[in-house]
Amino acid sequence: MTQSIIAFDIGSKTIGLAYSSGVIASSLDTIRFEEYNFDQGLKQLELYLKKYNPSIIVVGYPKNMNNTIGERAEMVDYVIEMFLDMYKSFNKDQIIKVDERRTTKIAKNILIQANLTREKQKKYKDSLAAQLILELYLESRKL
């Protein structure tokens, strides 16, 4: 049975998006908004939620390198709470946090290796990071 999954890579000005039907992760898009205006960013998710009707939302969780919870992870927790308040059809059990350490750096390196311009790197970095986060989740289910 296929399962619709969307992944978020949440930043202060962007939300990178990726999708999977349970097997292969694909980058979707990057939502852009004014810095820390998460309400503006979350409202833009509605189109993707209607189109893909996910049963699971995988969220990149930016722990510190020493495995502690820092400012960025607290920001992600805050955005998750806003998401659940805005989209009542979802509950906290459908939100899965995945350790995202180094995914943005890996995404940047992949885009550099692909010889993309800085402009294109900036355009695709967040959705590629979301794809990597989703791939980590899919791999963890195989274990």
Curated annotation (Swiss-Prot):
InterPro entries: RNaseH-like_sf, YqgF, YqgF/RNaseH-like_dom, YqgF/RNaseH-like_dom_sf
Keyword vocabulary terms for this entry: Cytoplasm, Hydrolase, Nuclease, Ribosome biogenesis
BP terms from Gene Ontology: rRNA 5'-end processing
GO MF entries: nuclease activity
Main location: cytoplasm
Domain of life: Bacteria
EC number(s) stated in the UniProt entry for this protein: 3.1.-.-
Family of the protein in this entry: Belongs to the YqgF nuclease family.
Name of the molecule in the record: Putative pre-16S rRNA nuclease
